[in-house]
Swiss-Prot record:
One of the multiple factors required for polyadenylation and 3'-end cleavage of pre-mRNAs. This subunit is directly involved in the binding to pre-mRNAs, especially on the 3' non-coding region. Required for the targeted 3' processing of antisense transcripts that triggers transcriptional silencing of the corresponding sense gene. PROSITE patterns: RRM. Residues 84-96 have a biased composition (Basic and acidic residues). This is Cleavage stimulating factor 64. Residues 9-87 form the RRM domain. Residues 105-116, 272-282 have a biased composition (Polar residues). Belongs to the CSTF complex. Binds to mRNA. Forms a complex with cleavage and polyadenylation specificity factor (CPSF) subunits CSTF50, CSTF77, FIPS3 and FIPS5. Residues 84-127, 260-282 are annotated as: Disordered. The gene is CSTF64. CDD domains: RRM_CSTF2_RNA15_like (cd12398). Transmembrane segments: none annotated. One of its GO terms (molecular function) is mRNA binding. Keywords: mRNA processing, Nucleus, RNA-binding, RNA-mediated gene silencing. InterPro entries: CSTF2_hinge, CSTF_C, CSTF_C_sf, Nucleotide-bd_a/b_plait_sf, RBD_domain_sf, RRM_dom.
Amino acid sequence: MASSSSQRRCVFVGNIPYDATEEQLREICGEVGPVVSFRLVTDRETGKPKGYGFCEYKDEETALSARRNLQSYEINGRQLRVDFAENDKGTDKTRDQSQGGPGLPSTTTVTESQKQIGGPVDSNMHQPVGLHLATTAASVIAGALGGPQVGSQFTQSNLQVPASDPLALHLAKMSRSQLTEIISSIKLMATQNKEHARQLLVSRPQLLKAVFLAQVMLGIVSPQVLQSPNIVQAPSHMTGSSIQDAQLSGQNLLPPLAQRSQQLSRAPHSQYPVQQSSKQPFSQIPQLVAQPGPSSVNPPPRSQVKVENAPFQRQQVVPASTNIGYSSQNSVPNNAIQPSQVPHQALPNSVMQQGGQTVSLNFGKRINEGPPHQSMNRPSKMMKVEDRRTTSLPGGHVSNSMLPNQAQAPQTHISPDVQSTLLQQVMNLTPEQLRLLTPEQQQEVLKLQQALKQDHMMQPS
């Protein structure tokens, strides 16, 4: 016990100039407290000093104070290195025996701390790390946290952190062994009491920053790791809702068509299951059913029409049983969209329903209103899908008079300005926005865009 207590009261003093005497060193060590003894180690053969010695104090507190205050004390052009005797006695003896003097680089000694962190062999474990290394490490951390980026090769001109950074200045005065001891203490605390270590670092963010800065200075954390994209960028796998929020915050497509929930009852003979559609940021775009281009051939008798209940909600797929005839004289593609309102006892022949009104996009043209059973005696640009029976009417004639016991919702046309705005939004969809849609929706939007371009070219200038 006495030997252990004596070692804790004794400090190792290294990097002593060869011309310094024991009296000078005793006076220097006596500045922090009473000195019991000081021994300057000399070579047995030559009698010359080896450049280090040992100072014993009366108590451990004085020895600890000497370790803090005498570190980097300058004497005759050298800075003293002070540490506890049991930590550095064997290391410095081995170094001096292999190199023949203090302060020379060693190639045979690797300290335990260097083995743990995998750093290179360095004889200046007790020398101050210096302002350049501290500010360089602080600059790397600042770049990783969003500040100016610093390359892997650092020069004094590349330093982005001001020299007045108090934390960097303080760590610059410490040696590598002291920084290693701090990191080891934090690691030991985290191992023994994880919650206490977490509370300590959270309550003292400067301590957390100092530990991080010390790891960069010692090479435990390399600048290349801090500059990797995984540190400074957000993860690439964003959830669907976050992508939708980001897209919808910047633009809201077809706002009049996304204000109320929509419902469509399934036809009695329908055997198609209800499908759950994936969430799409642009699900407000109505489904386009008509095929562009003049044709005298009827399309397939059973086409599927997707009806969206609301943005980001379920969709229903209802088989359509109407054969739509195309007139060979109709040079304008039939690409109109006619959503109609459907209550809970909904009309099964409705293609789209929206907010209590029927919306018809007829390339900016108004279509004459008429009773629900009135047939149109000219090529039609509107299409209705009937689920109760199959009807084939050439020339685009669609009649609702054959539907029994059904109430027709009142038809209301939106203003030409709104129609023009909606069509313009469809035409201005970017490829990135189209990729967010389903393949069927992409094809239908492309067909509508092509039809709008053809109609615009055919209109007189």
